[in-house]
Regions:
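Bacterial N-terminal signal peptides that target proteins for export
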Residues: 1-13
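A short beta-strand-loop micro-motif that forms or neighbors metal/cofactor-
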Residues: 113-124
Length: 131
């Protein structure tokens, strides 16, 4: 009986490693370069009705500048410190594209909605210099 559990565990681990390798290969095959991430950290939603309008507008504004959502979720587990209520990570090919998106008319409107309906902060993280 014990050997059956060990065999099942070994097969599960091999499957996990194989699936992980395939996923990583798929990401590299896409050739997607990430030069910047936009991080939005929402600690409180003050007006859910207004906030919902942001959720509907945001994807089109991001896609218009070549951005890709990496995470857009309320499901966050705190590790160190208090986890935010909602967290958004958006990848852009360059810092300039992230800045252009943030300065666009559509995103300026979305940022105003976010600031009015939430307690939050957002920032751009440059990845070009990471070695």
């Amino acid at each position: 009986m014990r050997s059956n559990h060990a065999l099942a565990l070994a097969l599960a681990m091999l499957s996990g490693f194989g699936l992980g390798a395939i996923a990583i290969q798929g990401l590299h095959a896409q050739g997607t370069k990430v030069g910047a991430y936009v991080i939005v950290d929402i600690t409180q939603i003050n007006d859910p009705t207004i906030f919902k309008s942001l959720l509907l507008k945001e994807p089109q504004a991001v896609e218009a500048f070549g951005g890709r959502f990496v995470a857009r979720t309320n499901y966050i587990t705190g590790h160190d410190g208090v986890a935010p209520l909602r967290f958004v990570v958006i990848a852009f090919d360059s810092v300039q594209k992230a800045k252009d998106w943030n300065d666009s008319a559509a995103q300026t409107e979305i940022n105003a909605i976010r600031m009015k309906s939430t307690t939050s902060r957002s920032f751009i993280i440059e990845t070009d210099g990471i070695k």
